[in-house]
Amino acid sequence: YGAHGVEVQVDKETGKVKILKYVAAHDVGRAINPMLLEGQVYGGTAMGVGYALTERLILEKGEVMNPNFRDYKMLTAKDVIPVEPVIVETIDEAGPFGAKGIGEPGLVPSAPAIANAIYDAIGVRLKELPMTPERVLKAIKEKK
C-alpha cells in the first residue's frame, strides 16, 4: 500500500505547476535493504511526476507521432523533484523474509496526488494527463 502527499504552487498566469514538497509513504513489508527501497520510491515517483505533468504519447492510427525525446517530454535529472520517502514496515508472512514488492508502486499515486494538490492550490480539478500548463490555464479559464 502507498500514499503520496504533495504541495504545489501554480502560476495562474502561465499555468506552470511547481512541486514544493512531496512525501511518498509505502508499506514494504520487511525493509531488507532500506536504501534500495528508497531508490525505488524515488524512481517510481519521478516516473509518476513525468506522467502527471509532461509526458504525452501521441498516437495516430496506432502510430506513435512523437517518437523522440524532443517531442515526448520526459523528465530529466534536472527536473526531478526532491521526495521524502516514508518506509512503512508491516511484516508480510506470505512474502520472502516478510517483504512485499516495491517495484513501481511509487508511480501509481503520483498523478492523483498532484491533481489533488493542484485542486487544493487553485480550486480547479484536472482530469486529463498530462496536466500541462496549457491544460491548467484552460481549466482556470473554464472555471471563471
Residue ranges and their predicted role:
Residues 1-144:
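C-terminal catalytic domains of large/alpha subunits in multi-subunit enzymes
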